[in-house]
Amino acid sequence: MGKSYWIWYPGDFELYHGMKQNFSRVERGFGWPAFWKSEGFRNRVAFRRTYQLEKETSFTVYSNAIGHVLVGDKKYSFGKKIVCGPGEVAVGVHTGCIEAFPCIYVEGEVICSDKGWIVEDYDKEPLPAGKSKYFTEPNQNPTVWEYSEKVYEPVSVTEYNGGTLFETELNAVLEAEFKNGYQPVLICCGESREEAIDPVHCYYSWQPDKETGKCPCCAVRFAYIPDCKPGEVILRANHQYVDIPVKASFHCGEDRLNQIWSVAEHTFRLCSGIFFIDGVKRDKWIWSGDAYQSFFVNRYLMADADIDQRTILALRGNDPMTKHINTIVDYSLLWLLGVDYHNEGYGDRDFLELVYPKMVSLMGFCNGRRDEHGFLIGKEKDWVYIDWADMDKDGPLCAEQMLYAACFRAMEEISEQIGKDGSVYRAEYEKLTAVIEKFFWDEEKGAYIDSFTSGRRNVTRHANIFAILFSIADEKQQEKILKNVLENDEIPAITTPYFNFFELDVLCRMGKLTEVLDKIRSYWGGMLDLGAVTFWEEYDPSVPKEEQYDMYGDHFGKSLCHAWAASPIYFLAKYFAGLDLVNKDGVTYILKPQMQYFTELDCTLPVGSNGVVRLVWDGEILEITPNADGGILELGEQKLSLVRGETRRVNI
């Protein structure tokens, strides 16, 4: 038999499962579907392929839809063996489904649903069919994701205030077993002990299903059953997850950093399922800005291109584009920059050609929302986010224009890469950066201001960080920004792990590795000191411990397991272990290890889809063992080639 996959209209699988993900939020007993435009999948599609058959062959088509198989001018039912050939045979599969996206599975020696099928929706030009490595058997249903499962017993069971407190794992389906028959008990769940023992304010409280004893899946580290003695009810946690292998490992001579890496990895894996989601507790939604940072961590931890691509397709939706992604202006821009970063890491030409028209239409949508100066502005019902921070958002926001400019440059490069003319994007980039300098650069302050329309000339870190990160500021301006903004304690500090990611990335690029490592130890280590087992959505060290879980006006509103807080993996891997992917001129990756920050190190990192590289440092000798092609080791001015399977040893 040929290798078959379930196939569908490209993007529909992601839109369908993305819809289910974004409709999964439940809070204190009520459902809360995501508050942005929900993109629909196609209900009527046709699959086509023409074969040149040397001899007679047979095949069978399975589908979740109604429809038929057309071979020549004869129609056949799904599930029936079809015999055809020899000669030219045109196969068409016509499907319609109201409940979900139509998909088919073609089983046969020669005619099978592998790469080569095209699909059309009777509206746009045919496209190569979509598929997934997770759906390769005829008895599967691509509309139902088959999760891996692992059952965890509680790590502790204690009596508290007349009830029973269980400590368990995160993001699980709780299963209750009753010693004396079913009881309609209330199970209060929490990411923290404080939340679980507060039945009034906890986010999740359930009565187990009478037949199965199960509760809905939720973020649960602690579970509390009031008015229940230990032993009367037995709880287990059934963790459902997508089994994406971790390719990286990290161990150094400092326990603090090892623990930070481990907790960041645990945090990130919990937020990595069918898609990258923000966190496992509150939203469980697919946010573009959160996903953008997840692409960076993914490259250095799992290097799984598929989850990147599923997330990208679920976020963008269909053309024409009528609303910003997640309603947020900057999240539309970060979607495009995320495609650029993904392409840099994995270089999947087929995926790039699939998504390129969506990139073009997104830029066209944004270009239609400019003011008289050419600045991108928020229209009615658009959310200009950037960060949870006080900044002057009167009129065009400088930080937004930095992202907008970066998108023009990314579009130029990607257009040229796939044989399109990128000059129009270069011209737009040059025009926009010129007016950014004219209206937002303040020479007296030595920094970019938030807004020029309010007259306040307010300076925050955000626009200035983006100016360096995307190379919009020149070298002299960057030095001024470093002094006047990044190293200036009078400029309000960043308090979210989300924007700490951007700030620390800039500091690393400017050679401030000591400061970055100290920040990783203190900021992420500060969460560990407060008992964190996963990293949080937000952390302000100045806030009293009893108020740390407060957010959005809710006593337990803060997510304590948030993907954007896993960024230490990226910093330690890229800037300290020193791995950078380049994919240019025959060089796949460059390794610039900074061993002066470690007493010892044993680290394995993925090199895109190309393999892995291992670094072992004992304080004197550095051993590099690559299982990837095209590597260069840079030690100061010295450049040494790295050959797959050969260990290189150097004294440092």
Labelled PLM ranges:
Residues 459-550, 554-556:
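Extracellular polysaccharide-recognition and catalytic grooves
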Residues 127, 145, 514-652:
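Non-catalytic C-terminal accessory modules of carbohydrate-active enzymes
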Residues 280-293, 333-338, 346, 375-399, ...:
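Carbohydrate-binding/catalytic loop surfaces
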Residues 203-231, 256-260, 268-271, 286-415:
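Aromatic-rich carbohydrate-recognition surfaces in CAZymes
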Residues 208-211, 318-334, 367-430, 434-504, ...:
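The feature captures the catalytic groove of carbohydrate-active enzymes
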Residues 233-234, 255-257, 299-312, 343-363, ...:
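Structural helix-adjacent loops and short alpha-helical linkers that scaffold large soluble proteins
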Residues 64, 99, 218-220, 289, ...:
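Short, solvent-exposed loop/turn segments at the edges of secondary structure
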Residues 1-274, 290, 306-307, 311:
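Extracellular/oxidizing-compartment recognition motifs
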